[in-house]
């Protein structure tokens, strides 16, 4: 079922990694939400790891600049840092805010399903789903 990473995602990543200023660093946070189906879970993981492999292997982004949260850590325990819950997402953003400097590049990629209710969009996570306001 995997169709690879959408080309616009790779293009965005390449533009962030291609020619950073010497003092600048790139940080990547990838969050895969609830899959709802094993086939989607596999596809989300493939998209996430394809992007992360390109960043770390091809563009030599340091592993400490990468955070990957997913629905199930047992899908790839060596690479998935934690489960994609509200608490872990908030902690990942707090950690990123501590590490990233003002001129650094930060890429946050949300892979998954969303919902829309009463005028508010949400990204589906384990537990409470987060809104755009939660990510601001």
PLM feature segments, named:
Residues 7-19:
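Bacterial N-terminal signal peptides
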């Amino acid at each position: 079922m995997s169709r690879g990473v959408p080309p616009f995602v790779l293009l965005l990543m390449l533009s962030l990694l291609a020619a950073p200023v010497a003092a600048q660093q790139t940080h990547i946070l990838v969050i895969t939400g609830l899959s709802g189906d094993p086939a989607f879970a596999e596809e989300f993981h493939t998209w996430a790891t394809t992007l992360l492999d390109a960043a770390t292997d091809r563009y030599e982004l340091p592993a400490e600049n990468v955070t990957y949260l997913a629905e199930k850590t047992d899908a790839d325990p060596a690479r998935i840092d934690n489960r994609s819950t509200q608490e872990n997402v908030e902690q990942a953003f707090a950690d990123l805010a501590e590490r990233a400097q003002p001129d650094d590049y930060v890429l946050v990629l949300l892979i998954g399903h969303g919902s829309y209710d009463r005028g508010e969009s949400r990204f589906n996570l384990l537990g409470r789903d987060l809104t755009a306001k939660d990510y601001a």
